């Protein structure tokens, strides 16, 4: 399972997130998208070396996140189970032309080198 798919299941969980600049954000996840952008509510943001700031809502860009600190009470076994079955790729059918080989009869061609 991809990490982002796991994080997308964490709706309404209270987590702490450390950013690459050292800021620690503590809040409740309202959503995570495929770019790992995370949306939080009831947020307490502790900037490095400054007093904490309380916010109603906060959106974090995914590439600014260093790591998530999950609560100990979170049941990882149930979240890590894949609920969608994988689709197996279809095998090519024998006798059908595949690729771009041997198909040189289109257009006027390149001429005779003059």
From Swiss-Prot:
<dbReference type="GO" id="GO:0035194">
    <property type="term" value="P:regulatory ncRNA-mediated post-transcriptional gene silencing"/>
</dbReference>
<dbReference type="InterPro" id="IPR034102">
    <property type="entry name" value="Sm_D1"/>
</dbReference>
<feature type="repeat" description="6">
    <location>
        <begin position="109"/>
        <end position="110"/>
    </location>
</feature>
<keyword id="KW-0687">Ribonucleoprotein</keyword>
<feature type="repeat" description="2">
    <location>
        <begin position="101"/>
        <end position="102"/>
    </location>
</feature>
<feature type="repeat" description="5">
    <location>
        <begin position="107"/>
        <end position="108"/>
    </location>
</feature>
<dbReference type="GO" id="GO:0003723">
    <property type="term" value="F:RNA binding"/>
</dbReference>
<feature type="repeat" description="1">
    <location>
        <begin position="99"/>
        <end position="100"/>
    </location>
</feature>
<dbReference type="GO" id="GO:0000387">
    <property type="term" value="P:spliceosomal snRNP assembly"/>
</dbReference>
<feature type="repeat" description="8">
    <location>
        <begin position="113"/>
        <end position="114"/>
    </location>
</feature>
<dbReference type="InterPro" id="IPR010920">
    <property type="entry name" value="LSM_dom_sf"/>
</dbReference>
<keyword id="KW-0677">Repeat</keyword>
<dbReference type="InterPro" id="IPR001163">
    <property type="entry name" value="Sm_dom_euk/arc"/>
</dbReference>
<dbReference type="GO" id="GO:0005730">
    <property type="term" value="C:nucleolus"/>
</dbReference>
<dbReference type="Pfam" id="PF01423">
    <property type="entry name" value="LSM"/>
</dbReference>
<dbReference type="GO" id="GO:0016607">
    <property type="term" value="C:nuclear speck"/>
</dbReference>
<feature type="region of interest" description="8 X 2 AA tandem repeats of G-R">
    <location>
        <begin position="99"/>
        <end position="114"/>
    </location>
</feature>
<comment type="function">
    <text>Involved in splicing regulation. Facilitates post-transcriptional gene silencing (PTGS) by limiting the degradation of transgene aberrant RNAs by the RNA quality control (RQC) machinery, thus favoring their entry into cytoplasmic siRNA bodies where they can trigger PTGS. Does not participate in the production of small RNAs.</text>
</comment>
<dbReference type="InterPro" id="IPR047575">
    <property type="entry name" value="Sm"/>
</dbReference>
<keyword id="KW-0507">mRNA processing</keyword>
<feature type="region of interest" description="Disordered">
    <location>
        <begin position="87"/>
        <end position="114"/>
    </location>
</feature>
<feature type="repeat" description="3">
    <location>
        <begin position="103"/>
        <end position="104"/>
    </location>
</feature>
<feature type="repeat" description="7">
    <location>
        <begin position="111"/>
        <end position="112"/>
    </location>
</feature>
<dbReference type="GO" id="GO:1990904">
    <property type="term" value="C:ribonucleoprotein complex"/>
</dbReference>
<dbReference type="InterPro" id="IPR027141">
    <property type="entry name" value="LSm4/Sm_D1/D3"/>
</dbReference>
<dbReference type="GO" id="GO:0000325">
    <property type="term" value="C:plant-type vacuole"/>
</dbReference>
<dbReference type="GO" id="GO:0005634">
    <property type="term" value="C:nucleus"/>
</dbReference>
<comment type="similarity">
    <text>Belongs to the snRNP core protein family.</text>
</comment>
<feature type="domain" description="Sm">
    <location>
        <begin position="2"/>
        <end position="74"/>
    </location>
</feature>
<protein>
    <recommendedName>
        <fullName>Small nuclear ribonucleoprotein SmD1a</fullName>
    </recommendedName>
</protein>
<feature type="repeat" description="4">
    <location>
        <begin position="105"/>
        <end position="106"/>
    </location>
</feature>
<keyword id="KW-0539">Nucleus</keyword>
